[in-house]
């Protein structure tokens, strides 16, 4: 087991560890606005979310317009489309922006002090704008089928109530954000650094598995930007009536995943208490 030693200056030195926990991000840092790397990351989130929505919603519309089930990708293909695109885009953008592509993921990482409030807000705006543009491209290229088959928008399916849909979104997002925390944990990253695809792969696979479970209930949101972009472009009352589910459910799921990972699995509360007790100046 590793041991923490606190020096007189209050610095924590960790022995026997082959990894270093990064320091917490500042809560709010206006200085980030002056950095090109900050805006480059926001642009990367915008483009990644645009591409994600274009490919996935186009896949959904293509599936729905096929009259022969054997000629379409099926629900399994839709799930692979979402999971596969997340795998590809996280792999491409992780080194630039962290590869969030999802306001719920950004929110969870903010709660864990991985990103500042300012960065989280800018990322969410970029993600929502990218989602709107991505779905807009689908409508421009496939206008007839797009309008006819629901625009890929999320809503509560017939036979399910809003409580069930909310629970499905909450649990689905918990699975995703929990996987993000686990895949990007410094301990695991140090151990698996020689295989760079090991972080994007489980994240994409989590998205795939959640889609298999929740497509019949809500069409699978677990990403407020995905749901918002589709709702804005499709713009039907039924979609907007259910829309709150696709923000509140994922954000509550992200909150639960962040708390579980930080305070149960990583035992952040116990470590903080131990450091407090071992420092005689406190």
Swiss-Prot record:
Principal localisation: membrane
Source organism per UniProt: Atriplex canescens
SUPFAM superfamilies given in the database record: Aquaporin-like
Placement of sequence motif NPA 1: 102-104
Top-level taxon of the source organism: Eukaryota
Protein's recorded name: Aquaporin PIP-type
Keyword Transferase: no
Presence of keyword Chloroplast: no
Entry keyword set: Membrane, Repeat, Transmembrane, Transmembrane helix, Transport
Function: Water-specific channel.
NCBIfam families: MIP
Listed transmembrane segments: 39-61, 74-96, 116-138, 159-181, 201-223, 243-265
CDD domains named among the record's database cross-references: MIP
Membrane topology, as annotated: Multi-pass membrane protein
Compartments reported by the entry: Membrane
One of the record's GO cellular component terms: membrane
Record's comment describing the protein's domains: Aquaporins contain two tandem repeats each containing three membrane-spanning domains and a pore-forming loop with the signature motif Asn-Pro-Ala (NPA).
Motif stretch (NPA 2): 223-225
